[in-house]
Amino acid sequence: MQVKNILGHRNQFMVIDDDGAVHFQSYDTHMAEITEIVGSEMLQLRMLSNYWSVTTAKHFKVWLEENRLWLAVAELIDHKVFKNLKDFMERVDIMQVSRFKVYVEFTDKDGNSNNYKLSLVGEE
């Protein structure tokens, strides 16, 4: 297991476990994990806590960038699925990203479960 502070902040961690899953922890809260879906080239982000703060969001964005998922989140924001990173962090349950597609399960503003599929630029 590897533990790394993000941006040198002593309470924002990226943890890589022995199975290859990458976790984001803010203080004592396990916020999210990224795993590779076996048998595919797809990454899955699972939000374990839908907490948001300015400090946590800043470090969460860096964590997403380091794990090649920020561009998928930015596309969802550009397509108005989410207003901003805060909205994403507060409402997402699962996001799956492949080379050309993003699939996200989230809670809408009325508390209902919803999903959205997005084809990324460059799809053949």
Question: What kind of region is each of these model predictions?
Answer:
Residues 1-124:
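Terminal leader/tail segments of proteins
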